[in-house]
Amino acid sequence: MKKILYVSCLCSPSTLDNLFSTASHKPALSIQKFHRLLVEGFAMHKDTCAVQTLSAIPVTPASHKRRLWRLPSDMACDIKYNYVPTINLPIMKNLLVFIIAFFKAILWSLRGGRKNKIVICDILNVSISAAALLACKLTRTKAVAIVTDLPNLMIGGLRQGGLKRKVHNRLTSALMFNYDGYILLTEQMNQVVNVHSKPYLIMEGLVDVNMAAADNLVTNKSPEKIVIYAGGIYEKYGVKKLIDAFMQLKGQDLRLHIYGPGEMEKDMPDYMEKDSRIMYFGVVANNEVVQKQLQAALLVNPRSSIEEFTKYSFPSKNMEYMVSGTPIATTPLPGMPMEYYPFVYLFEDETVEGFHKTLKNILAKPKEELHEFGHKAKQFVLTHKSNVVQAKRVLSLFEEV
């Protein structure tokens, strides 16, 4: 049986709910969902593996005033969540996380022998992944990197540049070439990250197998035709073009609901004043967004397909959209395999006029046709991209490492 230590910032659902509700600056939740789905996928393979986490507590001085953080381990879905205590101050936090995580990873690797043990590291969490990687090198334990973004192309988190970003990017880049295997979002990533041709797996995303039980019924749809965008609200992500295109649509029954953080937050009041059909909800809990998606007519991802970073990303929102059973309209992103194309509507013209035309055509379709199209997308991702299926593929990768 494989024993897996999952190193990231992942929290149990109850711990995350507490951190989210007490945060003065609400964090994006997509990376938490990505990691939790994979870990829960491992936990569903009880006969072949056992998984526990080693997690940096995802707090910053900007999000929480509390300085000393020491959280007890907790259990959820047969997963033990272990948290690294720290002091929530610049530099001090990262140093403490590195030191404590290093010794915890050493102890985990040596306790009971190294046989059949493997460590998975989220390389974008530099302090804790660097500590775990060093521990693995010293104990000769295999370490696999999970790469959800490339440091020098990140739009999230460290957007404003400066010394902090440069240090983060250099450390991440220096470390990411030293793993024994890689879990990547796109094939293009492999050319950049896997310079030593180690075993790797392309896993562009995953969906919650439990969504099979979530009913998406025509009778439960909102009486208005709601279009939802949930994600980072950045002009570079195509959000401004989406809004401009929507404002050209005619129909008082149409709505555009926007969820998420980003640089365009400050512009939202102006857009809502110009067009009362537009509503901005900020950052809300993921389960609330999922419920709203079930009631919507269309889910959209306007991210530009010509930006360099799109070669190395597959937005988790596309997977979340598809498993909801509500149809999705997206740009033809380079990182999206062709197998997805029959199950999504495409913005083939990525101008404001092109977005407007595509939205107009889709929203004119009968609701039954939209519902059937969304249902086929849901069945596709549940069959081929569920967290149980993807976790099994990762377990197969471990045999090659």
Map each language-model feature to its residues:
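Conserved acidic donor-binding segment of nucleotide-sugar-dependent glycosyltransferases
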Residues: 342-353, 361-367
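Conserved donor-binding/catalytic core segment of Leloir-type glycosyltransferases
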Residues: 5-7, 218-237, 242-246, 257
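Membrane-proximal helix-turn-helix segments that form the acceptor-binding/catalytic region
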Residues: 35-40, 103-110, 127-130, 134-139, ...
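Donor nucleotide-sugar binding/catalytic pocket of nucleotide-sugar-dependent glycosyltransferases
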Residues: 34, 144, 152, 169-215
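Nucleotide-activated donor-binding/catalytic signature segment of Leloir-type glycosyltransferases, i.e.
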Residues: 266-293, 298
